[in-house]
From Swiss-Prot:
Name of the protein in its database record: UvrABC system protein C
HAMAP family xrefs: UvrC (MF_00203)
Biological source species: Streptococcus thermophilus (strain ATCC BAA-491 / LMD-9)
InterPro entries: GIY-YIG_endonuc, GIY-YIG_endonuc_sf, GIY-YIG_UvrC_Cho, RuvA_2-like, UVR_dom, UVR_dom_sf, UvrABC_protein_C, UvrC
GO cellular component: cytoplasm; excinuclease repair complex
Function: The UvrABC repair system catalyzes the recognition and processing of DNA lesions. UvrC both incises the 5' and 3' sides of the lesion. The N-terminal half is responsible for the 3' incision and the C-terminal half is responsible for the 5' incision.
Major site of localization recorded for this protein: cytoplasm
GO terms for biological process, alphabetical: nucleotide-excision repair; SOS response
Disulfide bonds: none
Length: 595
């Protein structure tokens, strides 16, 4: 805890309000609310926390707070601050998404659309549907049944949909405003669950076509009837009152929250939505924050009713959704069972997440244990892997990645610029890097890896063994990963003498080695590109008197490219602390080089 934070903690009031945690760059990284600012903010800097909260606290360099009149006011302010600043540690709706709706436009000739924007434009909106697939499925069925206008053709022209019976060309078919209004009412009834009239009409048309021996058209109507029936089956009726409502349940475990929402429209459960995220405050307060992020977004259509769990403050939810929505905390009966069902589903979803995570960990752990057995060595908990990268010997580099318990530990990655080798000599380059890496391990008493994997065959393995055994007197197992002619991981070499370790291509052990080889190759190539770009940049600045390495570095850091420098003014370059004479000489040289 720095001195600034310590001083500010002493000044915190006991009022309700919002607090904004900032990092060392002044960026807002977390927004929270509290009934008592003093107790809540101080809690971050006292006692122990779980891993995710410790990560948050480790990045806090400063904080601000805003006092409010009430906890509800703090809740509303928190939502607005989160939406405005999008702090990285705050919960967000998945992919920042809004939900799709089916819309009937308010036009002379109405159209059916799918939209994620709910506007006050006179259109009719039905939904929400938690994904575009569900909305598209229903719209396709509507398109087949109701011949709405689908094109932007002039009134005196017909379109493709007219020829397949899915669009009434309004002028040619002499349709009236009453006709279109009737069509709108039919769709409203259909989407509101009153589809018996439509089914009866389809059955009558099917019989009529059959009587006329038009069996293909009759089959089309039969398929439409079956499609409506299938849709009915998917939309489970959970209430007979035909009301629109959202039913919420949530569950917390291991510092994570899962919120489950049942979307009920016209008494039918049309879809559900699941969101999982880490929480940092009280579970009830973060649940309210989640609801606020959803319902304060103007793109989201509110239902007539909302059911919430019994431990959630009803007054706060009512403040979030407004007077037009009724909020209930059911205590018994069928409504209570629906909230319990949403809560149960939230628990199942979160439990499944942890089960899958544990299975993944167990699978990876099993892979490294089996790898050790196949190689005849102790389980390689820590694996260090090396790869070289250069183009015809220019800008040669090497890179090391570290996998611990089968997972990459990027904090332990290392980059090496080759210092003692000239020209394209991979073996000499690797000899230098192995020497530098493990001399430091030995000198500083660092924990050596359980296994070293070279991105290469026998030559690379032998070089590493020679340095470790004969120069450093270290006994660390070294293996090599050879690639085939398609540059794909092919086989593992290990032993003394080297032999191919038999690994099935579909085994977890092979997949682990494949990931390691891909990662070290990616890391080495990325580093090489950075060095090559920097060297190219620096070489173009050579020959300017007064422009040494430090000033070149400043130019690279601030302008990023030669083009940006060429477009800069003398004053822009002077602002970096470079004398006017040197700045002018630099721009003159770049101007000459470009001609």
């Amino acid at each position: 805890m720095n001195g600034l934070i310590k001083h500010k903690l002493e000044l915190l009031p006991s009022n309700p309000g919002c607090y904004l945690h900032k990092d060392k760059f002044g960026n807002i990284i977390y927004v929270g609310k509290a009934k008592n600012l003093k107790n809540r903010v101080r809690s971050y800097f006292r006692g122990s926390h779980d891993t995710k909260t410790e990560l948050l606290v480790s990045e806090i360099a400063d904080f601000e707070f805003i006092v409010t009149e009430s906890n509800i006011e703090a809740l509303l302010l928190e939502i607005n601050l989160i939406q405005e600043n999008m702090p990285k540690f705050n919960i967000r709706l998945k992919d920042g998404k809004s939900y799709p709706f089916i819309k009937i436009t308010k036009e002379l000739y109405p159209r059916l659309l799918i939209t994620r924007q709910v506007k006050k434009d006179g259109g009719l909106y039905f939904g929400p549907y938690p994904d575009s697939g569900a909305a598209n499925e229903i719209k396709k069925l509507l398109d087949r049944i109701f011949p709405f206008k689908k094109c932007k053709n002039p009134a005196n022209k017909v379109c493709f949909y007219y020829h397949i019976g899915q669009c009434n060309a309004h002028t040619i078919c002499h349709t009236t405003e009453d006709y279109w209004q009737g069509l709108v009412e039919d769709v409203k009834n259909f989407l509101n669950g009153h589809d018996d009239k439509i089914v009866n009409q389809l059955k009558a048309k099917m019989k009529d076509m059959s009587d006329q021996m038009a069996f293909e058209r009759a089959a089309e109507y039969r398929d439409l009837i079956e499609a409506v029936s299938t849709l009915r089956t998917k939309q489970r009726v959970i209430r007979q009152d035909m009301q629109d409502r959202d039913i919420f349940g949530y569950y917390v475990d291991k510092g994570w929250m899962c919120v489950q929402v049942f979307f009920v429209r016209q008494g039918k459960l049309i879809q559900r939505d699941v969101n999982m995220f880490p929480y940092y405050n009280d579970a009830e307060e973060d649940f309210l924050t989640y609801m606020g992020q959803f319902y304060l977004d103007s793109r989201h259509l509110k239902p007539k009713e909302i059911f919430i769990p019994g431990d959630i403050d009803q007054e706060s939810v009512e403040a979030l959704v407004g007077d037009e929505v009724k909020v209930f905390k059911p205590k018994r009966g069928e409504k209570k069972q629906l909230v319990n069902l949403a809560t149960k589903n939230a628990r199942v979803s979160l439990t499944q997440k942890f089960d899958l995570l544990e299975k993944d960990i167990a699978k990876t752990q099993g892979a490294i244990e089996n790898l050790g057995k196949l190689m005849g060595i102790p389980t390689p908990v820590r694996i260090e892997s090396f790869d070289n990268s250069n183009i015809m010997g220019t800008s040669p580099v090497s890179a090391m990645v570290v996998f611990e318990n089968g997972k990459p530990n990027k904090k332990e990655y290392r980059k090496y610029k080759i210092k003692t080798v000239e020209g394209p000599d991979d073996y000499a380059s690797m000899r230098e890097v192995i020497r530098r890496r493990y001399s430091r391990v030995k000198r500083d008493g660092l924990t050596p890896p359980d296994l070293i994997i070279m991105d290469g065959g026998q030559g690379q393995v032998n070089v590493a063994k020679d340095v470790l055994r004969n120069e450093l007197n270290l006994s660390i197992p070294v293996a090599g990963l050879q690639k085939n002619d398609k540059h794909q991981t092919n086989e593992l070499l290990f032993g003394d003498p080297l032999r191919v370790i038999d690994l099935p291509r579909q085994s977890e052990e092979f997949f682990l080695l494949h990931r390691i080889q891909d990662e070290v190759h990616r890391f080495a190539i990325t580093f090489h590109r950075q060095v090559r770009s920097k060297n190219s940049f620096s070489s173009k600045l050579d020959g300017v008197e007064g422009l040494g390495p430090k000033r070149k570095q400043k130019l690279l850091k601030n302008f990023k490219s030669m083009t940006a420098i060429q477009q800069a003014s003398v004053e822009d370059i002077q602002a970096l602390g470079i004398p006017k004479k040197v700045a002018q000489a630099l721009l003159d040289k770049l101007s000459q080089d470009s001609h």
